[in-house]
A protein has these predicted regions:
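Beta-propeller folds
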Residues: 19-171
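Bacterial Sec-dependent N-terminal signal peptides
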Residues: 1-23
Length: 171
């Protein structure tokens, strides 16, 4: 009886394996690639996420529960002192009070690039450049959100946000 049940299970397994042929063309066309969601960034409250608009002019807030838009975090048309027409990406500070807006992205090699970054204050809707001395790479907020480190010309710089955005070279 046991041998018969194992034989039946193997028989059905072999039938299902032969049901679909996988071709090299299917693999090359990524037919069996897993779908994913790109470009969403969860917010601290755990109930909302942000996503950049397709035209690169707004950062929209959406509800996880409903999937519907609940507000606009940033808009190039309404931000004060905003001289850009669109942006490429953004980075939220740990407390979500500031946003680094990435513009004028220029690729260097594979995944590395330089860009001009702007600091957007969500509370007062004001925008100002991170640095006026040239494009930056890999900016990063400090854990408390009071400083931003970035790289320019293979040197590390630090911008202290509490002290008038003073920029100092670390290396």
């Amino acid at each position: 009886m046991r041998k018969l049940s194992i034989f039946i299970i193997l028989f059905f397994c072999l039938l299902t394996v032969g049901a679909q042929q996988v071709s090299l063309q299917d693999v090359a066309n990524r037919t069996y690639r897993a779908e994913g969601i790109r470009g969403i960034k969860p917010m601290l409250d755990g109930e909302h996420y942000t996503q950049m608009s397709t035209d690169g002019k707004k950062i929209m807030q959406y509800s996880f529960k409903t999937g519907k838009e609940t507000g606009t975090i940033f808009d190039v048309n309404t931000a004060r002192d905003c001289s850009i027409k669109s942006f490429d990406d953004y980075i939220m500070s740990p407390d979500e009070k500031l946003i680094l807006i990435q513009t004028d992205t220029k690729p260097i090699y594979r995944r590395s690039f330089t860009a001009n970054y702007y600091i957007f204050n969500v509370k007062n809707n004001k925008m100002e450049p991170l640095s006026e001395n040239g494009p930056q790479q890999v900016p990063l907020f400090s854990p408390d959100g009071n400083q931003i480190a970035f790289v320019r010309d293979n040197n590390i710089y630090l911008v202290k946000l509490l002290f008038g955005n003073s920029e100092s070279q670390v290396t």
